Structure formats: C-alpha cells, structure tokens
A protein has these predicted regions:
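Juxtamembrane boundary at the C-terminal end of a transmembrane helix
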Residues: 1, 279-296
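Hydrophobic transmembrane alpha-helical segments in integral membrane proteins
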Residues: 1-11
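Polar-ligand-bearing catalytic/cofactor-coordination segments
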Residues: 14, 18-31, 80, 84, ...
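Loop-to-helix transition at the N-terminal end of transmembrane alpha-helices
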Residues: 27-41
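Select subsegments of transmembrane alpha-helices in polytopic membrane proteins
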Residues: 37-48, 267-272
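Transmembrane alpha-helices and immediately adjacent membrane-cytoplasm interface residues
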Residues: 45-109
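Basic, amphipathic juxtamembrane/active-site segments
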Residues: 179-188
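Final/C-terminal transmembrane alpha-helix of multipass membrane proteins
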Residues: 264-286
C-alpha cells in the first residue's frame, strides 16, 4: 500500500510541471488553483506513505519480528522503513527551517514608518523607498504593504505604474504568499521527488501570470502598452524573476485576455483521477489499522 500511495503522491506532484505552458497562457489563475490542489494532495500522499512505512518498521522493532497482519502494507521491508523514517525526518526538519526563515524574512521585508514615503491606498499602504534599484513587492498581513522603489516609479509611465500596483494587489487578494511558500517547500523539503523543481517553477510562473491578467484587464491597447513597458524594464534591470520570464509575461500581454472560464476538463480529470486512486488506497489501508490499536 505504501508503494501505491507513494506512486499517487509522486504523480500528483509531477503533473503540474508536465507541459504547463498551454494553461499558463490560457488560464493562469485556474492553473494555480489546480496546481496547488495537485501539489497539496501529492505532498500529503507522500508523507502518508512514508509514515505508514515507518510505522510498520517501528512495529517490527517493538515485537521483535514480522507482523503478518500489517506486513503487506509496507512490503519494502526493514531497509525501506528505515529510508522512509529518514525521509520523514528530512521533510519535517526542512519544513521547520523553511517556516522559520519565511517568518523572519516577512518581518525583515516590512518597511518601518521612518523609511521612505508612506501613502494610504484603501485598506493597504503603498511605500516608496529611496533607491534607484527596481523593487516591487508585497507584504501581506493585518496591515498589508506594497513596496516600490523611487527609481522604478520614475522610469514607468502612469499606465505601467498602475499595472505594477494592481499586479501587487492581485498577489495580496490571491494570498499568493502561501502558494509561493508551497512552491518553496516543494523544491526544498521534497527535493528527492522527481519533477518537484519543474512543478515549483511552473507554479511560480503561474502566480505571476495570474496577477498579470488580473491587473492588465481586457482592453487590448492598454495590454500592449503595459507589455512594452514591462518588457523594456525587464531587459534593462533583469528584475524579480529574470529577463526570460519578463519576456514571456510581456508576450502574453500583447494578446487579448484569456476567457474567464476556459476548458479545464482534461486537467481537472487528471487531478480527480489521482485523488480518487489515492483516497481508495488510503481507505483500503485504513481497514487494517486494528493491529496498531491492539498494541496501544
């Protein structure tokens, strides 16, 4: 059962990284939603499989031999259980380090009242910091901030500057910080999973594309003006995510806005199929938990 559950998890994690470009172009926000669901399911299935294998190995140590009623749940044996236990320790340790770093980084990135120019814009604060470097990012929380540099604001036209601010607002509305953290967890704590890096990269690109579409709107002339502006800035400064990604984003803003509800049947079918198989495997395994309870 552990092998089947692990296979479901590996497939669910890898799926968003398999030919993601069509959905990144046509339906970036829906790509993010489906990718987060698939990755979350995959990570859960992988951890469940590793814990199940570790538990069977622990039972072997406790009783000093084979445990026939549950051995079929983890056929990989003692060495497999030991490897699973090591993987669990790795995942927990890396996740704890990542959570600590994310919390420290969030606190450090918030701009104090004495630095820069602070302007209130609805329920958030726009902060202009005194630097010529190209800087634009958000700080979520009870008092969200959009931080932008004086140099970037001076170089952008009014339309492009508004797009940048709306782009950052879209990140706040979409709670994209948590999705970005999920991508980081995937490529650090689950680094041993094939395709994890590709999926994490696709998810990050999807977050940027989704915010672009939310901010750009449907007016084609405005979209093309924005595309020219961010393309020029990306080539000049290589900011945020590299020149290639800036060019990819600007090329997709030249075209008309994608439909609000595209055809997602194939992607949804894949996520549903893997979810169903994983749930069935877990339910089948749960029917054999009585030996664990008998040892309590």
């Amino acid at each position: 059962m552990t092998l089947l559950l692990l296979a479901c998890g590996l497939l669910a994690v890898a799926m968003p990284g398999i030919r993601p470009k069509p959905m990144l172009v046509a339906a970036p926000r829906w790509f993010v939603r489906l990718a987060v669901a698939s990755v979350g399911l995959g990570m859960f299935a992988i951890v469940a499989a590793l814990l199940l294998s570790t538990s069977v190995g622990a039972l072997h140590l406790m009783v000093g031999g084979a445990v026939t009623p549950v051995d079929h749940l983890a056929p990989e044996g003692v060495f497999g259980s030991a490897a699973a236990a090591a993987a669990v320790v790795w995942i927990v340790g890396r996740s704890a380090v990542l959570a600590s770093r994310a919390a420290r980084g969030h606190r450090a990135a918030r701009v104090d009242a004495w630095l820069g120019k602070h302007e209130t814009a609805g329920d958030l604060e726009v902060v202009i910091i005194p630097t010529d470097a190209s800087v634009a990012y958000t700080i979520p929380g009870r008092q969200p901030q959009i931080v932008i540099s004086e140099g970037l604001r001076a170089r952008l036209s009014a339309d492009v500057l508004r797009f940048v601010l709306d782009h950052e607002r879209a990140h706040l509305r979409g709670r994209d910080r948590w999705n970005a953290l999920l991508a980081t967890a995937l490529e650090t704590a689950f680094v041993f999973v094939p395709g994890a890096a590709r999926t994490a990269a696709a998810l990050r690109i999807g977050l940027e594309r989704a915010a672009d579409e939310d901010a750009a709107g449907g007016l084609l002339t405005r979209r093309r003006t924005i595309a020219r502006g961010i393309s020029a800035e990306g080539v000049r400064a290589h900011i945020a995510c590299g020149a290639e990604l800036w060019q990819f984003r600007s090329r997709n803003l030249v075209d008309p806005a994608p439909p609000a509800l595209p055809d997602l049947s194939l992607a949804a079918l894949g996520v549903t199929a893997v979810s169903t198989v994983g749930v069935l495997v877990a339910l089948h395994a749960s029917a054999d938990f009585s030996p664990y309870l008998a040892l309590l």
